[in-house]
Structures are given as structure tokens and as C-alpha cells.
Regions:
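Glycine-rich, basic loop-to-helix element that forms the pyrophosphate-binding segment
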Residues: 57-74
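Short beta-strand-to-loop element that shapes/binds the nucleotide-sugar donor at the catalytic cleft/hinge
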Residues: 113-128
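Short, acidic, metal-binding catalytic loop of nucleotide-sugar glycosyltransferases
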Residues: 21-33
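N-proximal low-complexity "stem/linker" segments adjacent to membrane-targeting elements
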Residues: 1-24
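Conserved donor-nucleotide/metal-binding helix-loop-beta segment in metal-dependent transferases, i.e.
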Residues: 95-114
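Short beta-strand-to-loop acidic/aromatic patch adjacent to the donor-nucleotide binding site
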Residues: 79-91
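A short, conserved alpha-helix in the catalytic core of glycosyltransferases
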Residues: 101, 136, 148-166
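C-terminal catalytic/acceptor-binding lobe
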Residues: 155-227
Length: 227
């Protein structure tokens, strides 16, 4: 039996019922592995014991947890080609989304790219809860930008990949429903400042480096044609 080639990372804190639903939604729609990061300063006894890879550690915030899980994938799961994420209050809704995303990812030159699910059927298609290729992680060295804690990091990925190696999925191809149960996070101001600094000081150069590294062999329109 072929091993799954997609992993879904879920940072979660004190939301065992929501996590169970998120885990079930991944199982019901794909063959992807699930990896969860749980903070060790709270009671996690209500979380399921089986059916996913469980990492317990100190509270790091969303960005820190994602990067720990991404590093685990890179070091321990060589078969994984696409690394996705979702919040613990989200649900995967599109059967076969993992195979569709893999087909899209295979069209990126050098194995470097981002596949962005649709997370808002009515509004603008911003990059949120993105998936990146193994090559992307090898190139950048992290999943979420380490200067941020909770917010803005998906937009960093979107701005880096846009027009170079970004595939935006339709709601029919890959839709993630986000319940937005969070009450806000106190890192918004600091994350916004870090995001602005990155745009002003680094975005253009990082995009140029990425474009030169892959030789701009990635044609956005080709990535959108699935065969």
C-alpha cells in the first residue's frame, strides 16, 4: 500500500472537540497524515490518543508550533511531498483534495511552490491555511515566517509565491471551512509591524531570489492546468 504523500499540520490549544472534528474531516476527505502540536501547560487529556502524530511541547504560538511540525516532517517523513495546515476550528470539505493538490504541486519547477485552498466562498481568495511543497521548505527553512507569532505569515507565503509558484484552488477543488472561533490574539499589533517591515525591507529581494533560484521555470498558467 502506498504511503500518503501529504501531511496536514494542526496547531491546537484547549479545543479537543474542535480538533476531533478537524481530524475526522481530514480522514473523510483524504489519505493525508495529520500532525498536531499541543501545548504542555494545559490539560490535554480530552484529546484523542490515536489517529495522528502528536507532538507536545512548550507554548510557542501558531508560528512556532507550525515550524516544529514542519521540521518533524522534513526530518522523519521523507515520503511527504506536500505539507498543508489547518486551524483546529476548520473542516476539510472537498473529497480528494490531497490528490488534486499533489497534481498541482507536481507542476512546479524544482518542486518549489504553494497550493492555496479556498477558505472563503464569497470573498476575495487570499492565501490562508496554505500548503507548500517539500522543496519550498528546503529552500526557505521554515513553514511560517519566524518573525511573526500568530497573524500575517500566510500573506508572506502568498506574496512570495504570487505570479511565480502559486496555485489558487477553487471551492470545488479544495475548500476549507473556517469557523473562526478564536477570540483574537494579543500578537496582532506586533505581527502587523513585523509584516510591514518584511514587505518594506525584504519582500522584493526575496521574490527576486526565489524567481532566480527556480529560473522562473514555473509558469503560473501551467500550474493551473491539471491533467
Amino acid at each position: 500500500m502506498t504511503k500518503p504523500r501529504v501531511a496536514v499540520m494542526i496547531p491546537t490549544r484547549m479545543r479537543a472537540p474542535e480538533f476531533r472534528m478537524a481530524l475526522k474531516s481530514v480522514r473523510d476527505t483524504s489519505s493525508a497524515y495529520v500532525i498536531a502540536y499541543l501545548d504542555d501547560d494545559v490539560d490535554n487529556s480530552a484529546y484523542p490518543e490515536m489517529g495522528y502524530i502528536r507532538i507536545v511541547g512548550k507554548r510557542l504560538g501558531v508560528v512556532g508550533a507550525l515550524n516544529v511540525m514542519a521540521r518533524y516532517v522534513m526530518e522523519n517523513m521523507p515520503e511527504i511531498q506536500l505539507i498543508a495546515m489547518m486551524t483546529d476550528d476548520s473542516l476539510m470539505k472537498s473529497p480528494g483534495w490531497d490528490e488534486m493538490a499533489l497534481r498541482a504541486a507536481h507542476r512546479f519547477s524544482g518542486g518549489i511552490g504553494c497550493v492555496a485552498p479556498c477558505t472563503n466562498k464569497e470573498g476575495a481568495h487570499r492565501v490562508d491555511q496554505p500548503a507548500v511543497t517539500r522543496g519550498w521548505l528546503s529552500y526557505f527553512g521554515h513553514f511560517a515566517h519566524p518573525d511573526m507569532n500568530h497573524y500575517c505569515w500566510p500573506s508572506v507565503i502568498g506574496l512570495l509565491a504570487d505570479g511565480i509558484c502559486l496555485r489558487r484552488c477553487t471551492s470545488e477543488e479544495w475548500y476549507i471551512h473556517h469557523d473562526q472561533k478564536g477570540g483574537g490574539d494579543h500578537h496582532f499589533d506586533s505581527d502587523s509591524r513585523a509584516f510591514y517591515r518584511w514587505i518594506v525591507a525584504h519582500m522584493d529581494q526575496h521574490r527576486e531570489w526565489l524567481r532566480n533560484y527556480i529560473g522562473f521555470g514555473v509558469r503560473h498558467e501551467d500550474a493551473c492546468r491539471l491533467s
